[in-house]
Swiss-Prot record:
Its main location: secreted. It comes from the Eukaryota. Plays a role as a neuroprotective and antiapoptotic factor. It is found in: Secreted; Cytoplasm. It comes from Homo sapiens. Keywords: Cytoplasm, Secreted. GO terms for molecular function: receptor antagonist activity. The keyword Secreted applies. Belongs to the humanin family. This is Humanin-like 5. The lineage of its organism: Eukaryota, Metazoa, Chordata, Craniata, Vertebrata. Expressed in testis and brain.
Amino acid sequence: MATPGFSCLLLSTSEIDLPMKRRV
């Protein structure tokens, strides 16, 4: 199972990736 820190990092990456895709 992924650690809480990894899950938080993954979630943050997803939140950043979505806006970037919308800009493109």
